[in-house]
Amino acid sequence: PVGGDLGRPLSQTTKAAGKGSACALCPAFGRCGGCSRLDVSYADQLLAKEQQVAALFEGIAPAGALLPILGMDDPFHYRNKVISPYAPAKGAKRKGKDAKLARADILTGMYETGTHRLIPTDTCAIENETAKKVTLAIRDIMARWSMEPYNEDTGAGFVRHAVVRVGHKSGEVLVTVVTNGEEFPASKAFCRELVRRVPEVTTIVQNVNTRQTNVILGDKERVLFGPGFILDTLCGLTFRISSQSFYQVNATQTCLLYTSPSPR
């Protein structure tokens, strides 16, 4: 996948991505902690990874034992699981109990590398586009209905995260809304509105996490809409995927890994 951390040897690196880095593929690159190699062509990333593995096995493996690396035809928007935190924008304050939130009052995106400073992003080069659409729709619904984002510093606020999983083959979409409390006002209306905005959504689950922690999911859950899981097919096998399930985030390369013939 493009943009990953594995592979470019330091000898081939001009400098690590910094706060001032720019990249045509992503306006947040260099600040967002999601990618660190998005400014390097995919072909060069693959070459660097191949060279790194070759260096590790030099003097150990016989000559010609290293097979060419198998990359993706399209290394973008491959992540079928997207985790988006929500946080109040700096300085955002509601004037009175009944005052409305604005979209700009709610941040969602990725954390800056090594911090818990949220970098807002409306686009992402590696996340599934339907999943990204869901996370932004939730932000807009929160603003419209004055649903407070969670504040890590104070422990106040209601919506902490959205975890979205999209079936690679099935296209089914599971949305897990992580809340800071069990009571979910107008949950049925929320589900109707989210499905109206993103019709691909097939099920919505509320996960409750009231602990002041960086751990995303809590122990309590309830299904708000649909069956509470999605089905997807991987390498000819059907999997039932819930909010807590492990499932490879790059289904394309997973199938390639398991179906490629092994040398004897």
Stretch-by-stretch model annotation:
Residues 80, 88, 113, 152, ...:
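Intrinsically disordered, low-complexity regions enriched in small/polar residues
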Residues 118, 220-257:
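Class I SAM-dependent transferase core
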Residues 258-264:
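Conserved small/polar residues in nucleotide/adenosyl-binding loops
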